[in-house]
Amino acid sequence: MNSTQRDLIAGEVSKALARKVIPKDIMEAHDRGAIKLHDLDYFINPIYNCELVNLEDMLQNGTVINNKLIEKPQSIKTAMNIATQISAQVASSQYGGQTISLTHLAPFVRISKEKIENKFAKYPMLPEVRDQIIEDELKIEIKDAVQTFNYQVNTLQTCNGQSPFMSVCIYLNEDPEYAYEVALLAEEIFKQRIQGMKNKFGIEATQTFPKLLYFLDENNTYEGSEYFWLTQLAVKCTSIRMNPDYMSVKKMKEVIGYAFPTMGCRAILSLWFDDEGNPIFYGRGNLGVQTVNLPFVALEAKRDNKDFFEVLDKYLDLCRRMGEIRYNKLKGVKAEVCPILWQYGAISRLNADDDIIDVIDKKGFTVTLGYSGIYEATKVTKGVSHTTEEGHEFALKLITYLEDKCKEWKANNPHTRWALYGTPQESTTDFFCKAIRREFGEVEDVTDKGFITNSYHVDVREKIDAFSKFSFEATLQDHSLGGAVSYCETYPMQKNPEALLQVVQHIYENIMYGEINFESDTCGVCGLQGVMEYVDGKWTCPQCGNNDIKQMSVCRRVCGYLSDDGTWNEGRTKDIINRVKHL
């Protein structure tokens, strides 16, 4: 696409200019692959990574898009349509993911209901008949609103030719007053997601956006709770479409103190409170990520006969300096650089000539230290998997060390609010693996498999059941409070939703954030809806032999998001085809 090509060219220019600004020693560590400076293709622009969009402010108080005033909507259909327009504008103004909340849309369900009630108030009829008509009319409007929302999110394009990387928070108790309205919206979203969205072959396939974040709480997790029916529908949806994903209110409150959504696929904000002591989540964001290649560190320490943590400190300091560079380059930037964010409510309501750094400071934007390959680093250092007792002890020591470094940096420089982040590694898994191979040659259980394991995750080849995997990874996720997510791999579970429900309830009790992965593919030649096989370097339909990637949809969890194009880098593809089933 022309827009994508233009963005790629601009990205190469940005990378070249970034090399003239970033200190030589930091750039050299990136080039060697000891660290990864993410999103250098956007570095020269005064923009940031990801955010929680303050949709409530924008819908209730109005916003401006393309110099046109958008006033408070008067129906759920209009509100959801405006939400997609906001999302596209926000996505074109940053380079990471974004999250909106159904709680901010729920009041407009009530407005629509009141309009329907007024419409039928003048007609004489039995109260129970009127109530049924009102309910039916409201559900029709919600259905139309959700359908428009889905089509908009999946057909709108940002300035780089992509759909907005949007997540939707579905948290019934985020504002208990609107729990019922949130449930009505979620019900319709799940129903339409189950049905699927027709792809270019006319097959109802799994839609990739928006990502759905469903919060498990006391009122929806177990049989007998008020909204258990909605969780049953959510599980059915997951069993077919790999969405929603699940966040545990119980565990988040135990570990963090509050429950709130991720920014996009996994980034989590640090706590920040306003002058009245109220926690603030929406209208905040993250300034960027730099990731340390832990198996690279382990191999360098082993080669040079040095202490692992001594070598680690060297590369961590480079990451710290890079994070401060990201913060400092936003100093002096005026709000007019991106009105939708800084002037019209997504983040703040500044005047055009106000400095954005004041909001970044006052609202506690985070900077993140990413990490990759705890499994491989443990294998190099201790000779065992981190699922063993000895390996787990080292892994806990390592992730706690990284967590403490973030606390130390934040204390020394309160402007950079550091948080520890389990890097998604969509491309980094390949980048790091090849970097290690260049520096150290082929290394068993590190480079020979062709990829580096995501963050603290269990090696994708290791046999372990879903319940044990989530329980084990929870001990490490609890320290990765700048963002992390755990997965389990299953077969498609349409015929066994009861088993999947047990996994979901296990997530509620044991881990803050979990997802379920399986294959959801379609063949555009024969119409097969099943699993494409990877044969001789090509995805191939087992029914008709079609191996033209343009004539099929291969849908997998690539990082936190789903992807259905099947054209992933070598490392990510090897990760995907090596995944064992946990259920």
Walk through the language-model features, giving the residues of each.
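Conserved catalytic cores of very large enzyme subunits
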Residues: 1-363, 384, 388-554
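Metallocofactor- and cofactor-centric catalytic cores in central/energy metabolism, strongly enriched
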Residues: 140-150, 379-380, 563, 572, ...
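Contiguous, well-ordered alpha-helical segments that form the cores/surfaces of helical PPI scaffolds
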Residues: 367-380, 400, 557
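Glycine-centered flexibility sites
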Residues: 370-373, 482, 560, 571
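Long insertion/accessory domains within large nucleic-acid-processing enzymes
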Residues: 543-583
